[in-house]
Curated annotation (Swiss-Prot):
HAMAP family: Ribosomal_bL34. The keyword Cell division does not apply. PROSITE patterns: RIBOSOMAL_L34. The lineage of its organism: Bacteria, Pseudomonadati, Pseudomonadota, Alphaproteobacteria, Hyphomicrobiales. It comes from Beijerinckia indica subsp. indica (strain ATCC 9039 / DSM 1715 / NCIMB 8712). This is Large ribosomal subunit protein bL34. InterPro entries: Ribosomal_bL34, Ribosomal_bL34_CS. The gene is rpmH. NCBIfam families: rpmH_bact. It comes from the Bacteria. One of its GO terms (molecular function) is structural constituent of ribosome.
């Protein structure tokens, strides 16, 4: 059985990147929550 995490920079950016977050209402809420918390990095 192979490991579940097979790193890929492209997939990481597409799924968890800033533009992916901005594309949906839920993603915008995630960013807003992270801004409110004062996170240094908002997204991948």
């Amino acid at each position: 059985m192979k490991r579940t995490y097979q790193p890929s920079k492209i997939v990481r950016k597409r799924r968890h990147g800033f533009r992916a977050r901005m594309a949906t209402v839920g993603g915008r809420k995630v960013l807003a929550a992270r801004r409110a918390r004062g996170r240094k990095r908002l997204s991948a």
